[in-house]
A protein has these predicted regions:
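Membrane-interface helix caps and helix-loop-helix hairpins in membrane proteins
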Residues: 42-46, 67-75, 148-149
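C-terminal ends of transmembrane helices
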Residues: 35-45, 169-170
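Alpha-helical transmembrane segments
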Residues: 74-92, 157-162
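Hydrophobic, membrane-inserted alpha-helices
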Residues: 5-14, 31-37, 57-62, 135-140
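C-terminal membrane-adjacent module
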Residues: 109-190
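Structural signature of hydrophobic alpha-helical transmembrane segments
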Residues: 15-31
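Cytoplasmic-side transmembrane-helix entry/capping segments in multi-pass membrane proteins
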Residues: 47-59, 75-82
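Membrane-water interface of transmembrane alpha-helices
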Residues: 89-107, 125
Length: 190
């Protein structure tokens, strides 16, 4: 369920971009992001870097479209979202708090969280997501600058990148558990 909640604002954005305006899609995605944050707060969990950053990203782009440039193309909006989430991911690593760390700390014991390999694993998983975000951004750039590409090609790249990162997020802790034994195995239980 955690991965669903993390991706819910982005799924909302992608779905609504097909059926309504970019502005509505952005504000609804921000609302879904706020709902996820509220859900975490109610459960006594911390506000996440990715969640808060996503709400800020969707809201800022929504206000930009409303107040500054309502004619911005859907492809440019998608590129801005992809660039924004890539920036959130890179920033989280630059400040030494990879965004996956907050989620991982909620499912491991304190002893596991203190292990140096625990932080390394979170950098690796965040790096996998960063790679996926980069591929999604490249797909958006291709859709803008190579107009002959079929629409589905960008969607396939984004879908494959996101699903690969989600799979890696589940697989990597299991791999570490099998390779290094029980202490590193507590990296993820969800």
């Amino acid at each position: 369920m955690t991965i669903f909640l993390i991706l819910a604002p982005y799924g909302t954005f992608t779905l609504l971009m097909v059926v309504t305006s970019a502005t509505v899609s952005l504000f609804m995605s921000a609302a879904v992001g706020l709902a996820v944050i509220a859900f975490d707060i109610v459960r006594g969990r911390a506000i996440k870097i990715l969640g808060a950053g996503s709400v800020i990203l969707f809201s800022a782009l929504g206000f930009y479209l409303t107040l500054v440039d309502p004619g911005l193309s859907n492809s440019a909006v998608k590129l801005a979202v992809d660039a924004g989430v890539l920036a959130i991911s890179l920033t989280s690593m630059a400040i030494r708090r990879p965004f996956t760390l907050q989620y991982a700390l909620e499912v491991v014991d304190a002893e596991t969280a203190k292990l140096p390999d625990f932080m390394k694993a979170n950098y690796i998983i965040t790096g996998a997501w960063t790679g996926a975000f980069l591929l999604m951004m490249i797909a958006s750039v291709l859709m803008i600058y190579v107009p002959g590409l079929p629409l589905w090609s960008g969607l396939v790249i984004a879908f494959a990148a996101r699903n690969s990162a989600a799979y890696f997020t589940k697989w990597y802790p299991e791999y570490r558990r099998a390779k290094f034994g029980p202490p590193a195995g507590a990296l993820s239980r969800s």
